[in-house]
């Protein structure tokens, strides 16, 4: 394998708190599977090949992303922890002499800028491993970053393994790592399941690296919202609100007027032209294309497949689908089909 940068994305887990039959990473955030955001962030950050570790609902996940030629699917039949998931990729990457990004498929709020900062830090520090950290007001549930008196990272302690003093630490591990590939697999194989859950933690590999004298650095580059991993319907809803804000902010910066952002919902796949005005209580769902200088709503619902030409006017209360699109735009009548 040529020297490049690859990513291992952990997407095999089952979340009992989601109470769902659908694989967790296929739950949608603003119209897209949460895993899709992670894949795109890796691509935009310059990652060449993606190794996605799957387990529960593996065939469903593969079908959702069929046609993505940069993805190699890696099976993890039993979920024995993050280090075990990484080791499932060893047969594909054992001869790779580059950098391996490791992150989770249930963290769709990761930004490309954060991944690039992580990569730059890894390069300038010439580290064996680099992790991005976040500082949270409420660090409950997250692994804590333990540093010495000089600020050097000593390790990561999972929440349930923390002492009372460690629980007070607010710097946490959102699970974004960059490793020198051969060191990653060497030390992941040394991890033992010496914890409450009897799992193989990738965080333990970092502690073993440090004890062996390898340089491990951490960069506080993660916004608090990026640290959210979705493990419940409540977190799914919270993540959707944050993603919706990002979608609308990007559109407004491109010249779209959104009169009342909190009362407007726009799908991540929608395309909206400059100088279009979106009135309150409008929902734009699915792959919708809206031209320049349009006015939509209020109280309009545009279904997937809708295409509006430049200057279109959608009257209040209009429901548009691909089937009634021409009539709705021409007459501005209310449609309920």
Spell out what each predicted region is.
Residues 25, 70-72, 152, 215-217, ...:
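Conserved beta-strand segments of alpha/beta enzyme cores
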Residues 21-37:
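Short catalytic helix/loop segments, enriched in acidic residues and glycine
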Residues 2-6, 32-103, 109-113, 117-120, ...:
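Conserved N-terminal catalytic core of the sugar/cofactor nucleotidyltransferase
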Residues 69, 110-196:
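Conserved core of the sugar-phosphate nucleotidyltransferase
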Residues 257-337:
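Structural signal for interior beta-strand "rungs" in well-ordered beta-sheet cores
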Residues 154-244, 249:
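Catalytic-core segments of class I nucleotidyltransferases/pyrophosphorylases
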Residues 5, 49, 90, 187-188, ...:
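Catalytic cores of nucleotide-enabled group-transfer and carboxylate-activating enzymes in metabolic
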Residues 1-20:
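N-terminal nucleotide-binding beta1-loop-alpha1 segment
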């Amino acid at each position: 394998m040529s020297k490049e940068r690859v990513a291992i994305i952990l997407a095999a887990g089952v979340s009992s708190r989601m109470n769902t039959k659908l694989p967790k990473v296929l739950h949608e955030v603003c119209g897209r599977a949460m895993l899709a955001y992670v894949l795109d962030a890796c691509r935009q950050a310059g990652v060449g090949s993606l190794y996605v570790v799957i387990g529960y609902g593996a065939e469903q996940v593969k079908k959702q992303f069929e046609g993505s030629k940069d993805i190699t699917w890696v099976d993890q039949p039993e979920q024995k922890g993050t280090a075990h998931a990484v080791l499932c990729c060893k047969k594909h990457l054992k001869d790779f002499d580059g950098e391996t990004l490791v992150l989770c498929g249930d963290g769709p709020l990761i930004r490309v800028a954060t991944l690039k900062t992580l990569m730059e830090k890894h390069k300038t520090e010439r580290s064996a491993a680099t992790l991005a950290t976040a500082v949270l007001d409420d660090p409950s549930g997250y692994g804590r970053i333990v540093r010495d008196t000089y600020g050097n990272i000593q390790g990561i302690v999972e929440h349930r393994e923390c002492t009372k003093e460690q629980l007070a630490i607010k710097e946490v591990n959102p699970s974004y790592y960059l490793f020198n590939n051969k060191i990653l697999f060497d030390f992941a194989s040394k991890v033992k399941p010496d914890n409450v859950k009897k799992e193989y933690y990738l965080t333990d590999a970092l502690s073993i690296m440090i004890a062996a004298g390898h340089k491990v650095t951490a960069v506080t580059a993660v916004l608090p919202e990026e640290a959210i991993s979705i493990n419940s319907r409540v977190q799914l809803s919270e993540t959707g609100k944050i993603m919706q804000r990002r979608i609308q902010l990007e559109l407004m910066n491109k010249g779209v007027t959104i009169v009342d952002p909190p009362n407007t919902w726009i799908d991540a796949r929608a395309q909206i032209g400059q100088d279009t005005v979106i009135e309150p209580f409008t929902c734009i769902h699915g792959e919708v294309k809206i031209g320049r200088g349009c006015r939509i709503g209020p109280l309009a619902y545009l279904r997937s497949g809708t295409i509006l030409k430049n200057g279109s006017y959608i009257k209040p209360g209009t429901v548009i689908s691909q089937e009634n699109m021409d009539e709705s735009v021409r007459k501005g009548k209310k449609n309920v089909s």
